[in-house]
Amino acid sequence: MRRTPLYESHVSLGAKMIDFAGWEMPLQYTSINDEVATVRKNVALFDVSHMGEIFVEGEDTVEFVDYLLTNSFKNLRIGQVMYTVMCNEMGGIIDDLLTYRFGEKQAMLVVNAANIEKDFDWIVNQSKQFNVTVRNLSDQYGLIAVQGPLSERFLKTFVSDIDSLSYYTFASYSVFGKNCIVSRTGYTGEDGFEIYCHWDDTFTVWNELLQRGNNFGVKPAGLGARDVCRLEASYMLYGNDMDETTTPLEVGLSWVVKFDKDFIGKDSLIKQKELGLQKRIRGLEISDRRIARHGMYVFKGEKRVGVVTSGTFSPTLEKPVALAMLSSEIKISDEIEVDIRGSKVKAMIVKLPFYRGSVKSS
């Protein structure tokens, strides 16, 4: 199992460690609910160094990345970040990712940890007709997410001009004397920043953040809290809510699909749009405190209408919530049932997101 540069710190902080995509990662330090509360009310630090960084460089960078991804990279300004998906020819989602535009000839694609090798191979294979070089530099970067409504106020105490960074933009900063890329991005639904450090600098930056954060109430948070926060904010998780058998139109990501340009999978998505969706992701609020988990079936009367893709108890909303891939006949406010360990539990279809936090609008 692989370890991030912060492994020793996680162990010394008493983290419960788990295997996540072949990485030994912290699930929680204290309790998941406490860590979620820290994210929602103050500032939490996450180690997300297991994420992948793939660089595309060369004369055709803009043209190639624009073709590779569903969202419009050509329209992205230098210093901007873009959320997007990468599809196969059938419109199935290979991965969802963040794309950073460094210039006319360089882009960074930040991909999910479980998909690094798959994504890299796909990108290399698609690049052969373009004048670009594709490099997997995941081993050279650590990544720390600083998340919560007070993130800017905290970081401003040692990075003076951090408030000039608007939502979904990035810049180079000196953080505790280390050269870092900092973006105003995150996966929690709160305002926040992600700090890309050289692998060997990550431990120093993390430790300084923890020490400076002592008087600020800043605490580390694990993957458990990260998953609850993203689900409350209704952010999709690759491998649970979407994969190569689902399209961006089915999982509520039509806003990252730009049909006015060419991209891999465009023809298939146009056809799906014209024919109409057979299934789509919906939000569920469960009637009692039982949790609907991934893989549990959803019923409307006696008819099975779909399956739960993600579910948890939301400490912020004080009720269980879930995402489910359901037949398109199921609408907002419909009452349905989830088969939870052999008993059918009532639930209602609700509008997403479940929770809106302090995340800045673009």
Curated annotation (Swiss-Prot):
Gene3D superfamilies associated with the record: Aminomethyltransferase beta-barrel domains (3.30.70.1400), Aminomethyltransferase fragment (4.10.1250.10), Probable tRNA modification gtpase trme, domain 1 (3.30.1360.120)
Coiled coil (residue ranges): none
Biological process according to GO: glycine decarboxylation via glycine cleavage system
Keywords: Aminotransferase, Transferase
Transcription regulation keyword on record: no
Catalytic activity: N(6)-[(R)-S(8)-aminomethyldihydrolipoyl]-L-lysyl-[protein] + (6S)-5,6,7,8-tetrahydrofolate = N(6)-[(R)-dihydrolipoyl]-L-lysyl-[protein] + (6R)-5,10-methylene-5,6,7,8-tetrahydrofolate + NH4(+)
EC number assigned by the record: 2.1.2.10
InterPro entries: GCS_T, GCS_T_bac, GCST_C, GCV_T_N, GcvT/YgfZ/DmdA, GcvT/YgfZ_C, TrmE/GcvT_dom1
This protein's GO CC annotations: cytosol; glycine cleavage complex
Pfam families: GCV_T, GCV_T_C
Example GO molecular function: aminomethyltransferase activity
The protein's role, per its UniProt record: The glycine cleavage system catalyzes the degradation of glycine.
Assembly: The glycine cleavage system is composed of four proteins: P, T, L and H.
Protein family: Belongs to the GcvT family.
Protein name: Aminomethyltransferase
Organism: Pseudothermotoga lettingae (strain ATCC BAA-301 / DSM 14385 / NBRC 107922 / TMO)
Organism phylogeny: Bacteria, Thermotogati, Thermotogota, Thermotogae, Thermotogales
